Design a protein with these regions (language model features):
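C-terminal, well-folded lobe of enzymatic/effector domains
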Residues: 220-289
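Short secondary-structure subsegments characteristic of cysteine-rich extracellular domains
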Residues: 53-68
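Intrinsically disordered, low-complexity N-proximal targeting/linker segments that flank membranes
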Residues: 68-166, 174
């Protein structure tokens, strides 16, 4: 181990930089730590620059997002990660099979034996602070899009992430009164702590109207889209003059429409990330799924 210390340290450093490039800035936002050893160890076989580095890191990106949105590491994570490491290493090093053909992505279990989570599975993903892989995976997509603060517009960075709070887009108090579970990943946005307190228990429509008074609708939309928050489904409200049964029925329908639409947007982003593609929040939100 002592002889390989420099190589190990370099691998860890490159892994950390790679994760930052994917919007993973700290351990609290990492969906599964099973990927850490795999990526760090693979960097021993990846050059520092050039086309080969780009090719290999594209493979790592695909691997990372499959790890976040499949069930591969829900159980026996360490043993599964070791198998995936060996298969990925064969691709990166150009190892050949007995028939002379190269190993490919179809030979890696995380790709060949797993399917990406579907929209319905994303809808039920738990609150990201609870440290479930899928719940944190949903939040990781927003972090990858730099999760702009609703009020200031500040982008998420390694320097300000510790000042971000887990915000209920539909207020917890409002949903709780109607007997609706608010602690879903699709109802979460990572925003500045002061913004979180300022919003309080305002319904989404009221908060949007408050923002429109001092900034443009376009700017507000851009900030919300960086979290893949669908604007149309958020422009609800009008619960004040309804009876409790009417309010609860309307709120349940509005909330269901919101989380379903947001799950569709997240699913579209996940598919792009799992292909190693770049993300553009406005394009994802603008196009129909």
């Amino acid at each position: 181990m002592v002889e390989n210390w420099d190589k190990m340290a370099k691998g860890l450093h490159r892994m950390a930089n790679f994760l930052k490039g994917q919007g993973i800035y700290d351990e609290h936002r990492l969906p599964t730590n099973a990927v850490l050893a795999v990526i760090a160890a693979l960097y021993a076989y990846i050059p520092d620059s050039g086309d080969k580095m780009g090719q290999d890191e594209l493979l790592l990106k695909k691997y990372l997002w499959y790890a976040f949105f499949t069930e591969r590491y829900e159980n026996s994570a360490a043993s599964h990660a070791f198998v995936d490491f060996n298969a990925l290493k064969r691709i990166i090093t150009g190892e050949c099979k007995q028939d002379g053909s190269n190993y490919g992505i179809e030979d890696v279990p995380i790709f060949s034996e797993q399917s990406l989570a579907e929209v319905e599975e994303l809808i039920t993903a738990e609150w990201p602070k609870r440290a479930t892989i899928r719940g944190r995976g949903v939040l990781a997509v927003a972090c990858r899009l730099e999760a702009h603060d609703f009020a200031s517009g500040d982008q998420l960075t390694p320097d300000n992430i510790k000042g971000r709070h887990y915000h209920h887009i539909y207020p917890d108090a409002l949903l709780k009164e109607a007997g609706i579970n608010s602690f879903l990943a699709m109802n979460c946005a990572l925003i500045d702590d002061k913004t979180n307190w300022d919003i309080g228990r305002k319904d989404p429509k009221q908060y949007l109207m408050d923002r429109y008074k001092w900034t443009s609708e376009t700017i507000v939309s851009e900030r919300l889209q960086s979290h893949l928050i669908p604007i149309k489904e958020l422009e609800t409200g009008g619960y004040e003059n309804l009876s409790d049964p009417e309010k609860n029925m309307k709120l349940a329908a509005d909330f269901r429409a919101f989380i379903c639409r947001r799950a569709e947007l997240v699913f579209k982003a996940v598919k792009l990330l799992a292909e190693g593609r770049q993300l553009n929040a406005s394009e994802i939100c603008r196009e129909q799924t």
